[in-house]
């Protein structure tokens, strides 16, 4: 795509492209679905719907009528005590949940793979972090679940912590056992916050299974949705996999111990005082569509995913990571992929594919698919993450499969197999207080400095060093080795600078 002179020019050109979206947002620009459900006017005349809090429009931070109804409808749909609408994304929800549950200067136990918003909350609240290392899939080098054992050890060592933050599913779809983690956190009197930004759809997969059972079908199913597994607060990015617009999300309060007013108060401080009615309207529409047509949408989504996985295993040189294993290379094996270590398995809506056997890196595979009009979400090592959503249709999967077959035929198995960069044993940095201000310094000169921004490697997508941890020569050497091997590192800029506390 040619460079554009403005955002509008880019958006116009992008909209005109004949491409298939396997990236966020989840609606996939499927205008027809909005139109079929009676909402074409919002898309056709958006400028007239862009208003502020005029009389009759209600007020987000003091909802009494229409916005209160949307909140109540979501609470009923997800089966929770209360729902807050988010117009600053799940980021605002994560920060609000942490600040509402952890007092200033308090302690939070959190996964090292937490969203950047969690690190912002640490600074805002002067909160002391206790980091838990996620498991790593040794074969595929993907960040996996937070184990109940790891949480138990952290709780034992830090009984004064107020809350626990877990990300599940993670970016690549790997999930933690929220039921066990909830039990562990509650045993120590701690609230469990779940960043379920990538799993807003999971509750509807539950409903679909329940409906099928009511019709007499045998549907083995264990719930994945944190709302049903005892979590106290769950943050969902409805725009990532469902049908609302980018930037809109919801925060679900489930546990009786959570002070709803405390969460609402923090959100009033964090979010804009001019909330977008377009975003809130899209949240309203998303709730209505999923309530009225959710079962139909989820059934088609599941059917299409099953179709894709069964066809994908027949393509020579293609590996599809699903659970703790991968099948492919033309095996034709349709025994759908073994479960991950965690008994409930991964989120099947996240498709991680590799053609390393044909000599393609993740970047090269992404480029080849983009050339064929298939746009993925993220490259991580030899893998490409394809994010499916409620807006994808069977034709999208057909085009993806056709493109993968073409790539397989073009490269053939005679090419030299792609060898991913070597992995090195990650050192464990010492902890300090999280700094509240920072400065840029060269990586090589950061020995003894306290990190301000996380330094993250992809894969597996977990920080090497988190905010509040101390840089050492061992850590610096480890990061330099990763960079020399061509690994993707976030937190080190093109000039080799990192941000540390002052």
Set out the residue ranges of the language-model regions.
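Conserved PLP-enzyme active-site core in the AAT-like
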Residues: 7-12, 16-20, 80, 90-322, ...
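Short, compositionally biased
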Residues: 126, 131, 484-495
């Amino acid at each position: 795509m040619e460079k554009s002179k403005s955002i509008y020019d880019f958006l116009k050109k992008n909209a005109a492209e004949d491409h298939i979206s396997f990236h966020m947002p989840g609606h996939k620009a499927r205008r027809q679905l909005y139109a079929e459900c009676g909402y074409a006017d919002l898309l056709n005349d958006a400028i007239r719907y862009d208003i502020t809090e005029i009389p009759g429009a209600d007020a987000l931070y003091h909802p009494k009528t229409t916005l209160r109804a949307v909140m109540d409808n979501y609470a009923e749909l997800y089966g929770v005590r209360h729902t807050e609408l988010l117009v600053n994304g799940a980021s605002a929800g994560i920060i609000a949940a942490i600040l509402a549950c952890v007092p200033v200067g308090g302690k939070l136990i959190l996964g090292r793979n937490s969203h950047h918003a969690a690190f912002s909350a640490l600074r805002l609240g002067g909160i002391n972090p206790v980091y838990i290392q996620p498991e790593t899939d040794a074969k595929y080098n993907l960040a996996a679940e937070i184990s109940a054992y790891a949480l138990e050890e952290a709780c034992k060592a830090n009984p004064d912590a107020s809350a626990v933050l877990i990300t599940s599913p993670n970016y690549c779809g790997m999930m933690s056992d929220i039921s066990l983690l909830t039990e562990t956190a509650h045993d120590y009197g701690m609230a469990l916050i779940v960043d379920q930004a990538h799993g807003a759809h999971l509750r509807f997969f539950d409903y679909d299974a329940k409906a099928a059972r009511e019709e007499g079908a045998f549907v083995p199913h264990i719930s994945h949705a944190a709302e049903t597994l005892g979590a106290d607060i769950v943050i969902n990015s409805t725009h990532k996999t469902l049908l609302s617009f980018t930037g809109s999300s919801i925060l679900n309060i489930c546990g009786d111990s959570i002070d709803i007013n405390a969460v609402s108060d923090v959100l009033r401080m964090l979010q804009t005082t001019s909330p977008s009615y377009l975003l809130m309207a899209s949240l309203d529409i998303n709730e209505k569509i999923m309530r009225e047509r959710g079962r139909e949408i989820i059934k088609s989504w599941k059917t299409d995913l099953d179709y894709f996985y069964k066809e994908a295993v027949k393509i020579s040189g293609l590996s599809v990571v699903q659970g703790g294993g991968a099948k492919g290379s033309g095996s034709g094996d349709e025994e759908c992929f073994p479960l991950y270590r965690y008994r409930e398995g991964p989120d099947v809506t996240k498709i991680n594919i590799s053609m390393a056997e044909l000599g393609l890196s993740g970047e090269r595979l992404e480029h080849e698919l983009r050339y064929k009009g298939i746009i993925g979400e993220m490259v991580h090592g030899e893998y490409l993450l394809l994010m499916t959503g409620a807006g994808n249709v069977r034709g999208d999967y057909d085009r993806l499969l056709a493109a993968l077959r073409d790539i397989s035929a073009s490269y053939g198995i005679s090419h030299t197999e792609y060898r991913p960069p070597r992995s090195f044993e990650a050192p464990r940095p010492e902890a300090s207080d999280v700094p509240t201000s920072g400065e840029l310094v060269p990586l090589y000169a950061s020995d003894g400095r306290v990190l301000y921004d996380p330094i993250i490697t992809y894969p597996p997508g977990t920080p090497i060093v988190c905010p509040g941890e101390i840089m050492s020569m061992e850590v610096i050497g480890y990061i330099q080795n990763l960079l020399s091997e061509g690994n993707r590192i976030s937190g080190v800029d093109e000039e080799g600078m990192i941000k540390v506390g002052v």
